[in-house]
């Protein structure tokens, strides 16, 4: 595993932290995917790739904001040192997570990255990830999901995305579902059952953002749409358009 950090314009007045999920290949671990389910899993690092794409464009166009990118880089494989169902992990901010399903690994690596970013108290934390199949069930292959604790910023992001012809739709960050990830052994568990999976994943991430404004982008569908060959780069231009209009 690696944890890559990149900084642009760290002395700017407005500072943004951008976290990208970087699972280079996802077998599901001991909660093993089917062979068909693994076919596109080399694109499970689309969030990390997008994050680096965004900072590249921001730097090349000399934007006034400060941007720090954090990308945890792993593979989710079966091995003698792999995490197991039932393991309890202690995260960077001290909270503990019971692993119920090793195929819900993205939120585990992103929890530490979010906590690390939150320690710097940026003006805004964004994350982008191929996080849940539930978001694909809800929105299909062409629409990304947004979750946020700041409705005004979320609305502005969605408008910026529409202006460059990418579609995002807000999903509810419904605190009533927090109980679905309660654990008897830890502060939370990494899955919340069959229903509302995109929401419970977002609620887990919310545990690691501190008091910061935050937008979570779940791009599991459009990042690897069947409508074109390979990964799509979905979200890069939306984030760039959004960041250049922040103040």
Which residues make up each language-model segment?
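A generic structural signal for tightly packed, nonpolar segments enriched in small/aliphatic residues
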Residues: 1-247
């Amino acid at each position: 595993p690696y944890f890559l950090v990149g900084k642009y314009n760290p002395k700017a007045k407005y500072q943004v932290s951008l976290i990208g999920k970087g699972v280079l290949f996802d077998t599901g671990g001991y909660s093993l995917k089917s062979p068909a389910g693994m076919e596109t899993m080399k694109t499970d690092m689309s969030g990390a790739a997008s994050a680096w794409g965004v900072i590249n464009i921001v730097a090349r166009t000399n934007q006034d904001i400060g941007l720090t990118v954090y990308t945890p880089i792993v593979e989710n494989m079966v091995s003698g040192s792999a995490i197991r169902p039932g393991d309890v992990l202690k995260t960077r901010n001290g909270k503990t997570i019971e692993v119920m399903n090793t195929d819900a690994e993205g939120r585990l690596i992103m929890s530490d990255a979010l906590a690390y970013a939150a320690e710097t108290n940026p003006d805004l934390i964004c994350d982008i990830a191929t996080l849940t199949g539930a978001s694909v069930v809800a929105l299909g292959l062409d629409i990304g999901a947004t979750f946020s604790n700041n409705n005004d910023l979320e609305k502005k992001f969605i408008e910026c995305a529409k202006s460059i012809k990418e579609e995002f739709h807000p999903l509810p960050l419904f605190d009533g579902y927090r109980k679905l990830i309660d654990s008897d052994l830890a502060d939370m568990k990494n899955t919340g059952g069959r229903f509302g999976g995109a929401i419970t994943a977002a609620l887990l991430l919310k545990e690691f953002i501190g008091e910061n404004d935050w937008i979570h982008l779940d791009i599991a569908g459009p990042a690897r749409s069947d409508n074109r060959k390979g990964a799509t780069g979905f979200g890069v231009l939306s984030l760039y358009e959004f960041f250049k209009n922040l103040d």
